[in-house]
C-alpha cells in the first residue's frame, strides 16, 4: 500500500493549478458572483501563523462558494508603503522598493505553498505607480470638491520616526513603532472631510446586518454623535467670547471655571507676557493628545488673568489653561463643573477650586458626599435660580430657551470623530499631488502629469524624508501660472491606500480608477480580518466607498456585506511574537507535515472568531486524520475503478444506517459552512470517515458515495490531498470545479429508530423499533417486551409518557 507522501502530492497539485490557470476569474453574468477577500498583508518578509489562519479562512470560504457554482473572486495584494519598509531599508542598506519587492516575491511563494486559491492576475502592490496614480487622481477630485484641504494642526509628533501619528498610533504616550515619547507639534497637514459623512457613516451602520456587534459598537462610539448646547461665555473687559459645548446644560449654574487648551489663542496671547504660562504651554506639548491617555494622566493647569462672565448668573469665572483640553476638539474650551464631573472634581481638588452643587439625586435616601467624589448622575436642579426643581429633560429645554433668546447659546449636534489627517512626513509613501506656489497657493498637479512618481534612487537616513532634499523632485513650475514652485513633500497615510484596494482588484489594469467591472463584483460578499481594524481601516474604507459612490465610480453604499473578524493565534496563552520567544514558523510545519495538515489544524482547533491555542499535538492529530483518509482511498481504490452507482432498492440495513449518518453529517456540515463554523465542519468529516470504517459489510456503492461526499466537504480545507485522490479514484478531473454534495433526504428517513425506555425516570432498556409504528403500537410493543415486563410485573402502570421516536417513560407504583 502506498504511503501518504504529502510533499509529492502538494507539488504535483500546485503544478496542475499553475498549468491550468485554475484560479483565474473573469466576469460572468450567467452566474451568481461571490467576492471573498482577506485583508491584504504588509509584506514583512515571511508569513506567521496569524497569516496562515487568516488566509486559510478566506480560502476555505472561496473554495466552498466555488463548489456551490458561484463565480468567485479571491484576489491578493500587498499593503506595501509605510514606515516599517523605510526603517528596514535603512537597517539593511537597501532601497525600500528593493526590500519590499523581494519580500513580496518570497511571501507569494509561501502563499502558493499553502495552496491558496488567489487569482494572481489581479495582484496589486500599493507602491506600484499603476495603483497610486489613481489615488492621486482621486485626491485631486476630492480637493476640487472641497473635501480635501490643508490647515495648521496640532499633531502627535514622533521625534524618532520624524512623522505625525494618528491618535490610534499612540500607545501609552509613545509611538507605536519607535516607542519614543510623543510630542505635540503644530504643522501644516492635509485632511479629508470625513466629518461631512459622519451622519451617513453612523446611520448606515444599521445596514451592516452581517457585521459583528462589537465592531459596529466601536464605530458608533468612535463617530460619537451627541446633542447638546453651545454656550457663550463673554470675556470680561473684551468683545471676545469663548464658546463651549456641553451635553449637560442642567449643570450650567455649577460652572466654577473654564478650561482652555494650551494652544488656544487666548492662552498664547497671555503667554507672550507671562513666562510661567509660556513654560507651562511648552510642557504640555510633551503630553499625549490621545483621549484615553488624557483620562489617566495627571491633570495639570495654570490659572490665567482672563475672566469670563457667566451667561445666566453674570458671575465672574476664572479661566485656566489645562493639559486635558484639546484644541482640535470643539472650540478648544470646556466648561468645568467640579461638583458634577469627576475629571473637573480631581482638577478642583488639586488646585483648591470651590465646588457648587447644583444637582441633587432623585433618590432622597442617597447621600451625596462631594468631598469624596463628584455626583455625576442626572437628577433635580438646586441652587440654580429659576431652574430649581426641574429634572434633566425640562432643565435642558428651559436653559436652551433662555440662552437662545438672549443670544448666549444654541443647540448643537456634535461628533467625536474629526477630519482625517492624511499627511505623513516620510519618504516611503504615495506623494500627495499638490504644488505650492507663492502666487497661486496650493495647486493640484495636472491630471495628465500623473502619477507624481516617488523617486526610488534616494539616500535614506533616520532624519526624516529625503524628498525635500531632491531638487528634481521638489522644484517644479506652477501648473497655473508657470512660475517656480515647490512640490508637496508629504506622503499619504498608508490607510489611504488600504481604503480602496478592494475596489481596484475588480479592474487592476484599467486605465481609469474603476470601471464597470467594479459594479459587477462590489460590494465584497465576505471580508476577513482582525477586529483591531474596527475604527481605522474599516471606518476609512466605508468613508472611501461613499466618496467613490458620490464620484460615480461605484453604485453601492457600503463596501463589505459580511465581516468575519478572526481571533489571534496564541502559544502558552499569549499572542505569538518575537519578543516573547513563542513564534512558530509556518514553513517548518509545512516542511514537516505538509500544507494541508497546517491548514486543517488552523481550522479545526477553534472556530474562526475565537483565539486559537497552538498545539503540536493538535497538528499531529490533523496529520493522522489525513493519513487515515489517504489509507481509506488506498484500501478501496479497486472499488472506485468499477464506476459503481447507488441503487437504493439494493441497500442493506447496515447501508441505510451508514447513509443516515453520512447525510446527517453532510447536512450539519452545510449548515456550519454557511455559518463559518469551520471547526465543526471538520468534525463532520471525521465522523463520516468513522462511519465508513466502522461498518464491516457496507455495499461498495455506499463506500463510493460516502467517500466522495467526504472528499468534497474536506476539499476547501485540504485541497491538495482531495484534488489528488479525486483524480486517482477516477471521480473527476478537478474537485474544485465539482458541485458540492447535496443531502439526500431519503437517506434521513429511518426504517427503524432507537427508543430509550425508562421506568419512573430511570433507564431500563433500549429498543430498536420499526419507524412506521404508531404511538399506541409503540406502547404495546414496549409493554410486551420480556425485559421491560420483568420490571413492571405485579406493579400498577399509572401512566405512559411517550416522546415520539426518542423516549418512553412508564410510571408505576
UniProtKB/Swiss-Prot annotation:
Taken from the record, one Pfam family name reads tRNA-synt_1g
Look up the domain of life of the source: Bacteria
In terms of Gene3D superfamilies, this protein maps to: 3.10.20.590, HUPs, Isoleucyl-tRNA Synthetase, Domain 1
Chain positions recorded as ATP binding sites:
578
* Subcellular location as annotated: Cytoplasm
Keywords on record = Aminoacyl-tRNA synthetase, ATP-binding, Cytoplasm, Ligase, Nucleotide-binding, Protein biosynthesis
Q: Which GO terms describe its biological process?
A: leucyl-tRNA aminoacylation
Task: Place the motif 'KMSKS' region on the sequence.
Answer: 575-579
What name is this protein filed under?
Answer: Leucine--tRNA ligase
PROSITE patterns reported for this sequence:
AA_TRNA_LIGASE_I
Q: Which organism is it from?
A: Francisella tularensis subsp. holarctica (strain LVS)
Can you state which reaction this protein catalyses? tRNA(Leu) + L-leucine + ATP = L-leucyl-tRNA(Leu) + AMP + diphosphate
Q: Which PANTHER family match?
A: LEUCINE--TRNA LIGASE, MITOCHONDRIAL, LEUCYL-TRNA SYNTHETASE
Q: Is Signal among the key words of this record?
A: no
**GO cellular component: a single term:** cytosol
Annotated EC: 6.1.1.4
State the family named in the UniProt similarity comment for this chain. Belongs to the class-I aminoacyl-tRNA synthetase family.
Motif 'HIGH' region, residue numbers? 41-51
Does Translocase show up as a keyword for this record?
no
InterPro entries under this entry?
aa-tRNA-synth_I_CS (IPR001412), aa-tRNA-synth_Ia (IPR002300), Leu-tRNA-ligase (IPR002302), Leu_tRNA-synth_edit (IPR025709), M/V/L/I-tRNA-synth_anticd-bd (IPR013155), Methionyl/Leucyl_tRNA_Synth (IPR015413), Rossmann-like_a/b/a_fold (IPR014729), tRNAsynth_Ia_anticodon-bd (IPR009080)
Q: What GO molecular function terms would the record report?
A: aminoacyl-tRNA deacylase activity; ATP binding; leucine-tRNA ligase activity
